[in-house]
Amino acid sequence: MVPVIALVGRPNVGKSTLFNRLTKSRDAIVAEYAGLTRDRQYGEARWQGRTYIVIDTGGISGDEEGIDAKMAEQSLQAIEEADAVLFLVDSRAGMTAADQMIAEHLRKRNKRSFLIANKVDTIDPDLARAEFSPLGLGDALPIAAAHGRGINHMLQEALGIFPKDNAEEEGEGEPASEEVAEGEEPTRIPGPSEKDGIKIAIIGRPNVGKSTLVNRMLGEERVIVYDQAGTTRDSIYIPFERNEEKYTLIDTAGVRRRGKIFEAVEKFSVVKTLQAIQDANVVIFVMDAREGVVEHDLNLLGFVLETGRALVIALNKWDGMEAAERDYVKTELERRLLFVDFADIHFISALHGTGVGHLYKSVQESFRSAVTRWPTSRLTSILEDAVQVHQPPMVNGRRIKLRYAHLGGANPPLIVIHGNQVDAVPKAYTRYLEKTYRRVLKLVGTPIRIEYKGGENPYEGKKNSLTARQVNKKRRLMSHHKKAEKKKKDKRR
């Protein structure tokens, strides 16, 4: 499971700066959930091949009122959600009463905490350690978040307490370094979780019907092997079989009664949702048809797209809607979900079971598309045909040349294209290639990533040194050129 690390501390100690420093590899703040998780931001970060989730929180000063009290409450909640806490203090300002209050809270919660002395760029780190030693959280780790100093050592300490899971040890996703022999049929790359079948995460906003859908999927022709509580925050992993196919449902909805439909007010945990997406092969994204597409839906869909997981969209509570309402919702889906137009959309009623059975076909097709590998000859042939139909643009009077393509990874499919001037390939042309590969390979429900690699210039970075013979020749040419110029000037006079 992906570790979750919370950044806490009083205001203006550099939490947001450190958050941006840690998440810059993905260059994104995943989501801001106003009203649900006020002033908590969730980001995904990577360090030395390891993925982890960072929670940025509001400052805690101990004298909050009104909205500030709400922000402090959310910061304390982030501590409960996290697997480890990075407690930031300001080395320049020294220890304060607020620092002591937060340290006392962390000690009481018995949470694995690391004391981080920020802003040591102008202060002796040893002095900072001595200053904050009375907090009783061990030696402070000195960093300068603004300049990136001490970050690697800090992450080594913080992430070192978590065991690496199999996916991290084998590399992210399913690498496809092993080539398919020319002429072979495309094959499926077995994933590390194949013994549990396809892992399906049911995600969505609160009260869109996730619990009802889970119960409905388990209640139809089910053979439940066992219910196993997840290791983190009540996520439930439920292996089951349907039509001799193995699946594992990852239920993030919380309260659920097996055997009967039970729709409670769902406890929404961003951490649970993000971890479920990371651990799944396919995500079923549940939306409320009566509410349409809202901003929270787009935030979560953006994270699914960023992680590269296969996607199926289920529009729940479709029954009982008037024809005009349905037409409006379909128009909104076409307009606002263009960035995930590769995903199948199902209109269902989890309560009555309408359309639920069709989800399995889309799940299987999406998974198959995400983990299939293709030979280099096939991918190159598709590239050549695409270039012949629509050539890349000219750059500085020269045509971009795309020479060949091969598979660089799976889940999601990564197609590596080699050529010249590939840094100048426009995004619009990349989208054209993505759609071409999707259409020809008949890929459904999975994003495609295209990576370009240019040819290496063996003389790049080397100074052009002339031989003695070349130097003499250059001098003669320059001398001849000067004499010719002088004759021209004399004639003009």
Curated annotation (Swiss-Prot):
<comment type="similarity">
    <text>Belongs to the TRAFAC class TrmE-Era-EngA-EngB-Septin-like GTPase superfamily. EngA (Der) GTPase family.</text>
</comment>
<dbReference type="InterPro" id="IPR005225">
    <property type="entry name" value="Small_GTP-bd"/>
</dbReference>
<feature type="binding site">
    <location>
        <begin position="118"/>
        <end position="121"/>
    </location>
    <ligand>
        <name>GTP 1</name>
    </ligand>
</feature>
<dbReference type="InterPro" id="IPR031166">
    <property type="entry name" value="G_ENGA"/>
</dbReference>
<dbReference type="InterPro" id="IPR032859">
    <property type="entry name" value="KH_dom-like"/>
</dbReference>
<keyword id="KW-0547">Nucleotide-binding</keyword>
<feature type="binding site">
    <location>
        <begin position="56"/>
        <end position="60"/>
    </location>
    <ligand>
        <name>GTP 1</name>
    </ligand>
</feature>
<feature type="compositionally biased region" description="Basic residues">
    <location>
        <begin position="471"/>
        <end position="493"/>
    </location>
</feature>
<dbReference type="InterPro" id="IPR006073">
    <property type="entry name" value="GTP-bd"/>
</dbReference>
<protein>
    <recommendedName>
        <fullName>GTPase Der</fullName>
    </recommendedName>
</protein>
<dbReference type="GO" id="GO:0005525">
    <property type="term" value="F:GTP binding"/>
</dbReference>
<dbReference type="Pfam" id="PF01926">
    <property type="entry name" value="MMR_HSR1"/>
</dbReference>
<keyword id="KW-0342">GTP-binding</keyword>
<dbReference type="GO" id="GO:0043022">
    <property type="term" value="F:ribosome binding"/>
</dbReference>
<comment type="subunit">
    <text>Associates with the 50S ribosomal subunit.</text>
</comment>
<keyword id="KW-0690">Ribosome biogenesis</keyword>
<feature type="domain" description="KH-like">
    <location>
        <begin position="372"/>
        <end position="456"/>
    </location>
</feature>
<dbReference type="InterPro" id="IPR027417">
    <property type="entry name" value="P-loop_NTPase"/>
</dbReference>
<feature type="binding site">
    <location>
        <begin position="316"/>
        <end position="319"/>
    </location>
    <ligand>
        <name>GTP 2</name>
    </ligand>
</feature>
<feature type="compositionally biased region" description="Acidic residues">
    <location>
        <begin position="167"/>
        <end position="184"/>
    </location>
</feature>
<feature type="binding site">
    <location>
        <begin position="251"/>
        <end position="255"/>
    </location>
    <ligand>
        <name>GTP 2</name>
    </ligand>
</feature>
<dbReference type="GO" id="GO:0042254">
    <property type="term" value="P:ribosome biogenesis"/>
</dbReference>
<dbReference type="InterPro" id="IPR015946">
    <property type="entry name" value="KH_dom-like_a/b"/>
</dbReference>
<dbReference type="InterPro" id="IPR016484">
    <property type="entry name" value="GTPase_Der"/>
</dbReference>
<feature type="compositionally biased region" description="Basic and acidic residues">
    <location>
        <begin position="454"/>
        <end position="463"/>
    </location>
</feature>
<feature type="binding site">
    <location>
        <begin position="204"/>
        <end position="211"/>
    </location>
    <ligand>
        <name>GTP 2</name>
    </ligand>
</feature>
<feature type="region of interest" description="Disordered">
    <location>
        <begin position="166"/>
        <end position="195"/>
    </location>
</feature>
<feature type="domain" description="EngA-type G 1">
    <location>
        <begin position="3"/>
        <end position="166"/>
    </location>
</feature>
<feature type="binding site">
    <location>
        <begin position="9"/>
        <end position="16"/>
    </location>
    <ligand>
        <name>GTP 1</name>
    </ligand>
</feature>
<dbReference type="Pfam" id="PF14714">
    <property type="entry name" value="KH_dom-like"/>
</dbReference>
<comment type="function">
    <text>GTPase that plays an essential role in the late steps of ribosome biogenesis.</text>
</comment>
<feature type="region of interest" description="Disordered">
    <location>
        <begin position="454"/>
        <end position="493"/>
    </location>
</feature>
<keyword id="KW-0677">Repeat</keyword>
<feature type="domain" description="EngA-type G 2">
    <location>
        <begin position="198"/>
        <end position="371"/>
    </location>
</feature>
